[in-house]
Amino acid sequence: MRMTLITALVLQAIARGYRFGFQIVDVTGYPTGTVYPALRRLEHAGFVRSEWEHEGTATKEARPQRRYYELTPPGARALDGAREHIRTIGSLRPIVPKTAQ
């Protein structure tokens, strides 16, 4: 799976304890139309797994059921790789072009 900024941010949000979709939308600042497809791709790739909460909990709180996401070991490794890639990019120095002589 190609690691994009949004997929890395979604993985990071899940790793930090934001477990259901709207929490992830809030913390990343991306719209639902971006976050939910990313969650589906991450789940399909095996980087996250999801489970619906117990229906009784949602009913008791008078809201729709939430789907909770959890980072898998491959997802944790992918996130570590993305973080390392970002650190590497951050350490690059800009190339200053030589002026014509």
Regions found by a protein language model. Name each.
Residues R16-G17, H44-A45, G75-R77:
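Short, charged/polar surface micro-motifs in flexible loops or helix N-caps
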Residues P73-Q101:
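Amphipathic alpha-helical dimerization/coiled-coil segments
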Residues V35-A45:
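Basic amphipathic alpha-helical segments that dock to polyanions
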Residues Q65:
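Exposed loop/turn and edge beta-strand positions of beta-sandwich/beta-sheet ligand-binding modules
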Residues M1-Y36:
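N-terminal helix-turn-helix DNA-binding core of bacterial DNA-binding proteins
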Residues A45-A62:
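Beta-hairpin "wing" of winged helix-turn-helix
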